[in-house]
Amino acid sequence: QVLVMKDGKALYDRCFGYHTDANSEKVKPTDIYDLASLSKTTGTLLAIMKLYDKGRFNLTDKVSDYLPFLRKTNKENLTIRELLLHQSGLPSGLLFYQEAIDGKSYKGSLFKQSKDALHTVRLGVRTWGNPRFRFNKGMTSKEKNGDYTLQVCDSLWLNRSFREEIRKKIAEAPLKDKSYRYSDVGFILLQMLAEELSGKPMDEYLWQEFYQPMGLEHTAYLPLRYFDKKEVVPSAVDRFLRKTTLQGFVHD
């Protein structure tokens, strides 16, 4: 899709190609794409700004005042301002999914800097993964039922207890100095903060406060809750963790 606008008017608006190949959906103007890290500003930040405007918190407040699992940890004194500025000392990211993988289910290491017979999936510039692993017993299900309520892709659901694993991993993560360091972890905490203060899941709060009132008819968190799957363009083929094409679910 190519759109060129000037002074509020569309000068050029054309669609080309297909979602995956010539046998799939043609690209349409209303198709929905994964915004990836842009969701920090088009989602999480919007929610935080709205709650700030409503007087629900001050920027100098400690995050632990609202998220008790951070109390009595090295993150007890982190402020909301530091999270927003990426100056909290938090790591850039954490591999939460490792907590769901059975460490005894695969040979060798899970990651390696170069490709070999075991590490066949490229995950980064110098990172290759071993996809021959199993998840911990009781952690995943192929369908939603009972305690398995956290959907990761079409046929993978996590036990809701995994939220506690995420909180634990964040609480135990080391802190570095407070120079600028882009951090996904900081914005995960901001999402938790927004949901705690609003009393609503992030997708519902954003839909009600922003996307619906603004007439953004094809924008949403968790798009498959609001749109038909065929309206969403596939974003990645995950050969490592979920072993499927991702459509309507985040790729990282």
Language model region names:
Residues G8, I32-T60, F187-E195:
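Active-site SXXK
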Residues K26-V27, T73-N77:
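Extracellular/periplasmic catalytic domains that process cell-envelope and extracellular macromolecules
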Residues Q1-L35, R56-N58, E164-E172:
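Short, conserved catalytic-motif segment at the N-terminal edge
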Residues T20, D31, K62-F69, E99-I101, ...:
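Short linear capping/connector segments at secondary-structure termini
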Residues L59-T73, P213-M214:
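Short, glycine/proline-biased beta-turn/loop segments that scaffold the active-site neighborhood
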Residues A47-Y52, L67, L84-P91:
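Generic hydrophobic/packing signal
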Residues K75-D252:
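Short, surface-exposed loop or secondary-structure junction motifs
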